[in-house]
Amino acid sequence: MQIISDKTEFKLKGVSAVAIGKFDGIHAGHYRLIDEILRQKKNGLQSVIFTFFPSATVYFGGEDAKELTTREEKREIFERMGIDVLVEFPLNPETAATDPVDFVKKILIEMMNMKFLAAGEDVSFGKGGKGNRVLLEEMAEENDFTVKIIEKIFDHGKEISSTYVREEILKGNMELASELLSR
C-alpha cells in the first residue's frame, strides 16, 4: 500500500475510487465505504482512502479529543484489506480554509484522478464543513465521476459511529464495542 502523508501537493497515477472519512475506530459504516471502493478495482480503478491528519475531531476538538484507532493501526487495517493508496492529508489552518468546490476539483479530481467516490451521508469537508453530499452529487454530474452515498447503519436503534463505540467503551461495555468494530 502506498502511503501519502503530510503532503498537500501530489499526483496519483491512474484513475481512483476514493473513500473519504475520519476512519476512527473502523466500524460497519467504514467497512461499507471500503467495500464500495474495493469493488471498483474490477473496473480498473485503484482503491484510495482519503483522510485528514490530524482528524477533524482532534484538530477542531482540542487535545481532549480521543481517537479510537492510532495512525499505525489504521494503516495496518487498510493494508490488510487490500487498499492501494492511503492519503493522510494534512489538516492545518490553510487546508481547513479550502473552499469545498476547490477541494473536490483540485484535490479529489486533479490530484487523485477520482472517478468514483464513496462517502457517508453526513460527509462534510472544506471551509466551515460546508461541503456535503448535495454538493458532491451536483459536482459528480458536472465533473464525470460517480458518487455513492452510504446511509447510516443502526444497531438496536442507535447509529453505529465512532461516538457510539466511544460511549460503550466509557460504560465498560467492551464486548459490544469490540463487536461494533469487528467485521
Over which residues does each language-model region extend?
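Nucleotidyltransferase catalytic core that binds NTPs
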Residues: M1-R183
